[in-house]
A protein has these predicted regions:
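Flavin-dependent oxidoreductase catalytic cores
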Residues: 1-249
Length: 249
């Protein structure tokens, strides 16, 4: 079976095609520092034979043989001032149905600044020893919100057409490649279908995938849903396994 055959993402060689998606473990300390439990969790996964592990934090060693990718993201409107200490931001001043606050629309200058910060974050991940980074553009977070007509109502160069809505993600990927090198693998995670009225559908997602590939993404990681369709992101036990695999195909 191909799933057990070696695979290559850019110059990163994987021993098989089995990948652990980034998942919140709550194993880190309250201030975000990795704990021994968190490290052991990922080491055991690597020893189990996974080809690539995508972690939600920055503290893993490669001694068990697997490759490790750091997922980087910005919550955007899917958070609250109670957590961040400031008003959430988004592509538009449009409230997420699951959140208590309306975000502030980002200025173009703020967008440019954040693009640089994503690139700097990826550079630090590379310097820390990560084999790759995953740019998280799924589930309605800031990057995903820019790409989606469900949350992006802008009328400037970052809104409207799918190319304009993808511009933020593309500029982030380009900035990462500029700072980390063309050979450094960049994965892009996206929700192929958002399952909300007016959200991303498969035809636009096909275009989005090609655009981020054009910008330099080496791998597309397909998920589905946004916070307003959480039942799709975290399906209940009655949902058949691999129910959304056709979206990725």
């Amino acid at each position: 079976m191909k799933v057990f055959e070696p695979f290559k993402i850019n110059q990163m060689e994987l021993k098989n095609r089995m990948v652990v998606s980034a998942m919140v473990t709550n194993y880190c300390s309250e201030d975000g520092m990795a704990t021994e439990k968190f490290i052991a969790y990922h080491e055991h996964k690597a020893k189990g034979g996974w080809g690539l592990i995508i972690t939600e934090d920055y503290a893993v060693t490669p001694t068990a043989g697997g490759k490790i990718a750091a997922q980087i993201y910005h919550a955007g409107r899917e958070t609250s001032s109670a957590i961040t200490g400031e008003q959430p931001v988004g592509p538009s001043a449009l409230k997420d149905p699951t959140m208590p606050e309306t975000p502030r629309e980002m200025t173009v200058e703020e967008i440019h600044e954040l693009v640089e910060q994503f690139g700097d974050c990826a550079r630090r991940a590379k310097e820390a020893g990560f084999d790759a980074v995953e740019v998280h553009g799924a589930h309605g977070n800031l990057i995903g919100a820019f790409a989606s007509p469900f949350s992006n109502k802008r009328s400037d160069e970052y809104g409207g057409t799918i190319r304009n809505r993808a511009r933020f993600a593309m500029e982030i990927i380009e900035n990462i490649k500029e700072k980390c090198g063309k050979d450094y693998p960049v994965l892009y995670r996206m929700s192929a279908v958002e399952y909300v009225p007016g959200g991303l559908e498969i035809e636009e997602s096909k275009i989005l995938a090609r655009l981020v590939e054009e910008a330099g993404a080496d791998c597309i990681h397909c998920s589905q849903g946004v916070y307003a369709s959480t039942h799709v992101i975290i399906p209940p036990s009655v949902v058949p396994r691999a129910a959304y695999v056709e979206n990725a195909a």
